[in-house]
Every structure is written in C-alpha cells, then in structure tokens.
C-alpha cells in the first residue's frame, strides 16, 4: 500500500503549491454537499461531514464557502444533485483502478472517463471485476514530526482501536471505517491531531517500472484532473524514487 500512499502524499504537497487549488475546492464542495445531504448538516452528529470540513479547512477554504455548501446539501440553499458513483477500470500493465466520482450527469462522466482511459492505454471494466481487489478502510494521517517516539505512539494507537500503523510520513493509522471518528478522537485526546478520511486500500499490488510506470501515473493524473472524479485508487507498486522522478517529468 506504500506506493499509493506515496502518490497521495505527492499530490497533497502539489496541491499546496500549484494552480489546482480551485479544482480541489470544487471537489471538496461536492463532498460537503453530498455528506450533508446524506447525514445532515451538523458535523457533531455526521462524522463524514466533520471529516471533509476538516480537510476543507486544511486546504484554506473560506468559512462562508463551507457553510453555503452545507446548506446546499441540506436543502436550505438551492444546489446541484450530485450522485456518488464508482467506476472500475484497468490501467496499463494490468493495474486495477477504482474510480470514485460525484456527478450530476452519469452519462457524461462515463463517456469522458471512457475517452480518457482509451487515450492513455486503459479501459473501463465490468462492475465487480476490480472492487474485490480493494478494501474500504479509515485512515488517520499524523505528521511524523509530531511523534517523538513511534513505538509509544503505536501503543497509544492500538489502545485507541487502530488495526495497523504504518511508519511513513505522514504516519498512517488504519482503522475500520465505522471506528474512524472514535479512533481519531482518542488519538487527539492523547495529543495526536491528524486528518481522517475513508479510503480504499489494495489487498495486493502490481509491481510496475519504467515506461509502464509513467503511463500508469500519467493516466491517474489525467483522471483526477476530471472535475467529476474525486479520487482514483490503484493497486500499483512503484519505487518511491522512480515515482518522484516520473512526477517531476509529468509536471514539467
């Protein structure tokens, strides 16, 4: 899972630096609207809304934008009716893609994704052919510099209900999705504040190198640039150094 975590961390760092901030806001607004629609507008009783609000604040989204998005979700303000859809696909080298989208037009989104996949050596897959390769989990990311003693932190995390702890930067605390908020709050009460999200972790990975690695990362980058795509989960395993080099090349 470390390969895809590295990819996520690179994207997170880029987001703080480049012109894609407006695109990130667009995606976060959709998540807030859907979370409020599904679970109500009070983040204290809606863990999903609470988590996305925290991410929006971390991205420096204005408070007014957050509040208006919540009201669009609850129906207090007029808003677009977004649907959550999972598209399953394959990238070059047999890498499985689990594409999470929010759209107001399923046909448009499917057509656009089919075009992007075809253009970059991928293809849409039949429903169910990829889903079994991924496991839904909660992830809490704790900045490594906030943890002085990893072993001590790991014990605290396990006592808090964590299933696994991955020593990376940021440190990844893995939980059952339904325990995400509980574990996050327990860690926070012990002085470890972190960003929480629900994600899909591959059960096994496909080692990819060279030209294939570049094609896979290019395809995922292009897919995530699509306004309707919230996140692309993949089961690739690409060496960290090679991934950094490819990303620098793609950005250039």
UniProtKB/Swiss-Prot annotation:
Coiled coil: none annotated. GO terms for biological process: regulation of DNA-templated transcription. GO terms for molecular function: DNA binding. GO terms for cellular component: cytosol. Keywords: Cytoplasm, DNA-binding, Transcription, Transcription regulation. Gene3D superfamilies: 1.10.10.200, 3.30.70.980. Disulfide bonds: none annotated. InterPro entries: Integrase-like_N, TACO1_YebC-like_2nd/3rd_dom, TACO1_YebC_N, Transcrip_reg_TACO1-like, Transcrip_reg_TACO1-like_dom3, YebC-like. It is found in: Cytoplasm. Belongs to the TACO1 family. This is Probable transcriptional regulatory protein Tmel_0985. It comes from Thermosipho melanesiensis (strain DSM 12029 / CIP 104789 / BI429).
